[in-house]
C-alpha cells in the first residue's frame, strides 16, 4: 500500500507550511487526484487519520478533487478524456495516445484556524 508513504509525504509538506506560517491548526485539506494516479482515496483517508494524530492536522478533513485524465490522440489529432492507462481513443479507437494529465496527486488547498 503505497498510500502510506504518500500520506506521510502529504503530512510532512503540510507540517512544513504550518511551521513557516506559524499555523497551529489545520481544519481541511483539498487534494487533486487523477484517475491514473493509482491512488485509492479511502486508503489515503485511513492513513491520514492514523498519521495525523497528535499533529496540527488531527481531526482535519480530507477532500478529494477529481482531475480528468487527458490524452492526445496521434491518429485523430484530438485531446480526449481517458479512464485508464490502456484506453483507446474514444473518438476514433486509436491506440497511440500521449497522456497529458490524470496521474497527479497534489495538495490544492489547506484551510487553517
UniProtKB/Swiss-Prot annotation:
It comes from Actinobacillus succinogenes (strain ATCC 55618 / DSM 22257 / CCUG 43843 / 130Z). Coiled coil: none annotated. Zn(2+) binds at residues 73, 76, 89, 92. This is Hydrogenase maturation factor HypA. GO terms for biological process: protein maturation; protein modification process. Pfam families: HypA. GO terms for molecular function: nickel cation binding; zinc ion binding. Ni(2+) binds at residue 2. Gene3D superfamilies: 3.30.2320.80.
Amino acid at each position: 500500500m503505497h498510500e502510506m508513504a504518500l500520506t506521510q509525504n502529504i503530512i510532512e509538506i503540510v507540517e512544513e507550511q504550518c511551521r513557516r506560517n506559524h499555523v497551529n491548526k489545520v481544519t481541511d485539506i483539498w487534494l487533486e487526484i487523477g484517475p491514473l494516479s493509482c491512488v485509492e482515496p479511502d486508503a489515503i483517508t485511513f492513513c491520514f487519520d492514523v498519521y495525523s494524530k497528535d499533529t496540527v492536522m488531527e481531526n482535519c478533513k480530507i477532500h478529494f478533487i477529481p482531475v480528468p485524465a487527458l490524452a492526445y490522440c496521434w491518429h485523430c489529432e484530438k485531446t480526449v478524456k481517458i479512464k485508464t492507462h490502456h484506453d483507446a481513443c474514444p473518438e476514433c479507437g486509436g491506440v497511440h495516445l500521449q497522456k497529458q494529465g490524470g496521474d497527479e496527486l497534489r495538495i490544492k488547498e489547506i484551510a487553517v484556524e
